[in-house]
Amino acid sequence: MADGTFLNAMTVEDVFAIPGRGLVVTGTISDGSFSVGGNVTILRKDGSTRSAVIGGIEQFRKMLQTANKGDSIGILLDNISKNDIGTGDVIRS
């Protein structure tokens, strides 16, 4: 992302809180890959942005370190509240 372009993307399909863990967003990766510990930018539908860190990735009850294009996953986002992200927003890195 050094030149300002994003190589990885996922549109948020659902958002929910898991007690004791945090906020999870679900979707299918449309481009690239995401890894635990990676920094991401949330592009809101209203044009605003938020920054977050991937705290975990889960696919069908299996914890992953990395997920790739085409994978349907849940991403645990650190330091994000339910007001900071919604369905239709895009996660990029």
Which residue stretches match the model-derived regions?
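C-terminal effector/interaction modules appended to NTPase cores
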Residues: 2-93
